[in-house]
């Protein structure tokens, strides 16, 4: 049974007889950036609770997500923890998730979720709030022409942009489309290539503050600006998200919003355990991202 607005749970009528302790983790990536730390939080919690885990990687491709979900349905796993694929777009695999639900298999999303599954249980960050705080900080530091680089195919990018745009309007600043760059997962590796650097620089030229989708992008922006003899933070302030190791080894240490990596993994795992062991409804969770100010915004 599912009740809108009251969380999600598997009723005694729909829950199948448990066949074991098999939990599948489905993630976009595993080996780099913040993903290993999130996965560690999930693994430690589920392993300590006695569950057996399998790890599946989509590389943010919907066709790979479909293949994995079909395999999980045929294997009849007991629970699934998922990081959605291209969550800003309509997802063609929603019916596969509904099949899992009909089978009585609880699903918990982390980092993002699908709006086409409105009653989902998820653990996400408050991206809109952090995007707003990023602009507020830049305004406090004296910035007036603020640009941004955001990811278009994941929900987090839209949330961060929503806060970014709200902050500009609230502070009476111009929201200039020419100074906002959007990119997809497939385009990230091309953003800062030599044959694209002039385009990127022209889009951000004249900005005195730049909000970047994550630390990887902030690192690329700082490198791009320095190659064009623009100093960070003296001429331009730069903010990233996630407070990853990249923010520390960047030539200019990057001010960044802290992603609650281990906490998110543990929370997602605990929600799944609750759904497996109880018929009480489970609620979504939105986590704050505190600011960690470093060199890239210090004047």
Give a label for each model feature.
Residues 1-19, 298:
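N-terminal helix-turn-helix DNA-binding module of bacterial transcription factors
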Residues 33-48, 130-133, 155-175, 220, ...:
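Short, solvent-exposed amphipathic alpha-helices that sit
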Residues 145, 175-179, 232-237:
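Short acidic capping loops at alpha-helix termini that bridge into adjacent secondary structure
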Residues 132-173, 283-298:
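An alpha-beta-alpha
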Residues 47-57, 148, 165-194:
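Short beta-strand elements in bilobed, periplasmic/extracellular small-molecule ligand-binding domains
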Residues 11, 15-136, 202-205:
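Alpha-helical recognition/docking segments in bacterial nutrient-uptake
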Residues 116-148, 166, 190-198, 218, ...:
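Hydrophobic alpha-helical segments within soluble ligand-binding/sensing domains
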Residues 197-299:
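Flexible loop/turn connectors
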